[in-house]
Amino acid sequence: MAKKKKSPSTPTRSLIPILTVLFVISLSLFAYVKWATTNKAKLNPQKTQENLVQVVKPINLPKPSLSSRTSVESAMQSRRTARNFTETALTMKLVGQMLWAGQGVTADWGGRTAPSAKSAYPLTLYLVANKIDGLDSGLYKYIPGEHQILHQLVLVKSGDLKAITGDSVGQNAAKEAPAVIFITGDMEKMAKAFDDKRNDNNVYLEAGHAAQNMYLQAESLGLGMVTMAGFNGEKVKEV
């Protein structure tokens, strides 16, 4: 595992962009609320059915650690934004720990690491794997579980996505990062928790909760991280 480098001195759909998060050194994360892309599936039902067979096969992640030598106070004190990467591949343990920090299930009733208004939990994390030991390149959905802890990945799209991920935010760092995480939010799910009244601000707030959790987790793991809110929505949909 690479060591952390010292840093120099009105939405129209239920799913919309929120935030971009990058993990640097040996991990990068993107946080988004992503647009739905169901129209593509309708164009080729047969191909969609074939993809579903691939999607439903879960990959179990290593059990997350519940303690470390770094206190919360120490992580907050030393947390800094970083923008440089090493070429070292990530491990499944590191990636799983970061995903768990963002949206891991911590209670049998579905409670997660990040709080949610009325326990709606509208966020979903997606991982773009570029250089992770034991994991093929592609886009994966994180499955934390609902009323039981699952902590799994499911393949959504295979292949090298470095270029398109980098283009979506206009930064080369995204192309070089071993891993990218999208934070997505379901606005309709949150609205249902409020008697079908839109409450998008809570989704944005929760994306911030998840991002901060990952910031502190990255610090504890000796990884760097940067959050970014600027991205090209149309290119994000292509991922």
PLM region spans:
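Glutamate identity and glutamate-enriched acidic tracts
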Residues: 3, 50, 73, 87, ...
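N-terminal Lys/Arg-rich, disordered targeting/topogenic segments
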Residues: 1-13
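Intrinsic low-complexity, intrinsically disordered segments enriched in polar/basic residues
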Residues: 3-6, 60, 201
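Short amphipathic alpha-helical "recognition" segments used for binding
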Residues: 7-10, 38, 44-46, 216
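Short, charged, solvent-exposed linker or helix-capping segments at domain edges/interfaces
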Residues: 137, 192-193
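N-terminal amphipathic, basic helical "cap/leader" segment at the start of enzyme domains
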Residues: 15-177
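Small-aliphatic-rich amphipathic alpha-helix that forms the alpha element of a beta-alpha
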Residues: 79, 98, 125, 179-190, ...
